[in-house]
Amino acid sequence: MSPSSVALLAAVVIVVMGGAAEAANTKFVSASCNTEKIARGSPFFNNLRDAIEDLRQNTAYIGYDYKTSHVGSGGAPTAYGRAICKQSISQSNCTSCLSNVATRIYGICGNAIGARVQLTDCYMQYEQRSF
């Protein structure tokens, strides 16, 4: 192989290897769940579900640290949420990590009125009060 072919091959390998984004690290780190419970399907639960979806969809595109609130309708309490991703991961990996943490937050904390779950590359929190 000529020296120019070797150089071209090396450049292609570097571009391909450098361009391949590593998946988000979704290893469980910690969780904290409020002992007070809410009813699934209640107005607050629906606000909470909307807040979590908002966090999942938008955190990667709003500085990797995003807070939201979903105002209760008909007197239901407002749901407050926050999500954070490590700055070192891609936007798609941030969204993927938050999808993972959103599933886990329900699995770990069930119907808790407030919860926090930390994975290696992302974090999510929700409460019935502002923070």
Curated annotation (Swiss-Prot):
PROSITE patterns: GNK2
Residues where alpha-D-mannopyranose binds: 34, 116, 127
Pfam families: Stress-antifung
Gene Ontology MF, one: D-mannose binding
Disulfide bonds: 33-109, 85-94, 97-122
Gene3D superfamilies in the cross-refs: Gnk2 domain, C-X8-C-X2-C motif
Keyword flag Signal: yes
InterPro entries: Cell2Cell_Antifungal, GNK2, GNK2_sf
Alphabetic keyword roster: Antibiotic, Antimicrobial, Disulfide bond, Fungicide, Lectin, Mannose-binding, Plant defense, Signal
Signal peptide: 1-23
Keyword Signal tagged: yes
GO biological process, one term: killing of cells of another organism
Domain Gnk2-homologous: 26-131
Domain of life: Eukaryota
Protein role: Exerts antifungal activity through its carbohydrate-binding specificity.
PANTHER family: ANTIFUNGAL PROTEIN GINKBILOBIN-2-LIKE, GNK2-HOMOLOGOUS DOMAIN-CONTAINING PROTEIN
Name of the protein in its database record: Antifungal protein ginkbilobin-like protein 2
